[in-house]
From Swiss-Prot:
This is tRNA pseudouridine synthase B. Belongs to the pseudouridine synthase TruB family. Type 1 subfamily. Responsible for synthesis of pseudouridine from uracil-55 in the psi GC loop of transfer RNAs. It comes from Streptococcus sanguinis (strain SK36). GO terms for biological process: mRNA pseudouridine synthesis; tRNA pseudouridine synthesis. The lineage of its organism: Bacteria, Bacillati, Bacillota, Bacilli, Lactobacillales. Keywords: Isomerase, tRNA processing. The active site is at 38 (nucleophile). It comes from the Bacteria. GO terms for molecular function: RNA binding; tRNA pseudouridine(55) synthase activity. Its EC number is 5.4.99.25. It holds the Pfam family TruB_C_2.
Length: 292
């Protein structure tokens, strides 16, 4: 069994939980996912099955789109709604929407983030959330991410000295939207947190077409595996190149092939089928991952 699944992960489960349950449903162990979602986050979780697991690194490279809600007026230990309240800065006056929009626009492009303590980023061999649960604070390494767009998508609502509004963000892999929400609040002079989040697009797949675990199980029960999408969907942003019969044989035998390209990596195709991921070595390309 080989292919890619557009899974709608529900709230309350980790990405690992989703993979574990899919292994039982599909009765196969070779399953991985293309980008972790926090337990409270709903949305697209790209799933790789069989040979497609070798494409996970390329699936993760593609940009992602999220829709969610930011709350100004209080911050939490986890930067989202699941944490304990850390600080309060009451919102006592109406806010200027133009100022919020301007602040959001100023956070686009290449930016640097410090990952939250409650995250799976490793420092000295341990995940940050392990330090956080033990009450330990450690220095967290900055990372560079790209925010392609960051827009407010609703009017501002006010309740209990807090302000809320919805947003849409398109960003690179490795972006912590929780941290983006907190940093926006800081720009506006408020403690803040991300109060809701949904991933609507990832690895070329949309939430509109995603299936839940229950829906997948129902289809498997009647031997309907049409939800398995082809490996070709998993090449991410790699440039495609069509191979000749002779080049396919060279790839099959692990030989270098000559191609007119300067790309570090290419996706080699033959008759619309993915044959190999090719890696540039000086003046030729070496088969790095072969799918024949």
């Amino acid at each position: 069994m080989n292919g890619i699944i557009n899974l709608r992960k529900e709230a309350g489960m980790t990405s690992h939980d989703a993979v574990f349950k899919l292994r039982k449903i599909l009765k196969t162990k070779k399953i991985g996912h293309g980008g972790t979602l926090d337990p409270d986050v709903v949305g697209v979780l790209p799933i790789a099955v069989g040979k497609a697991t070798r494409l996970v690194e390329f699936m993760q490279e593609e940009g992602k789109v999220y829709e969610g809600e930011i709350t100004l007026g209080c911050s939490t230990t986890t930067e989202d709604a699941s944490g304990d309240i850390l600080d309060r800065t009451p919102v006592t006056e109406l806010l200027e929407e133009a100022l919020i929009d301007e602040a959001m626009e100023s956070m686009t492009g290449e930016i640097r983030q410090i990952p939250p303590m409650y995250s799976a980023v490793k420092v000295n061999g341990r995940k940050l959330y392990e330090y956080a649960r033990a009450g330990q604070e450690v220095e967290r390494p900055e990372r560079q991410v790209t925010i392609y767009s960051f827009k407010r998508t609703s009017p501002i609502s006010y309740e209990d000295e807090q302000a809320r509004f919805r947003f849409r963000v398109k960003c690179s892999k490795g972006t912590y939207v929780r941290t983006l929400s907190v940093d926006l609040g800081a720009k506006l002079g408020f403690a803040s947190h991300m109060s809701q989040l949904t991933r609507t697009f990832s690895a070329g797949m949309s939430l509109d077409d995603a299936l839940t675990l229950d829906e997948i199980a129902e289809r498997v029960a009647v031997d309907d595996f049409s939800f398995l999408q082809p490996l070709e969907l998993g090449i991410g942003d790699l440039v495609r190149v069509e191979l000749s019969d002779e080049q396919v044989e060279d790839v099959r035998n692990g030989r270098f092939i000559s191609l007119m390209s300067e790309e570090a990596e290419l996706a080699g195709f033959y008759k619309e089928k993915l044959i190999a991921i090719l890696e540039k070595r000086e003046e030729a390309y070496k088969p790095r991952k072969v799918f024949l």
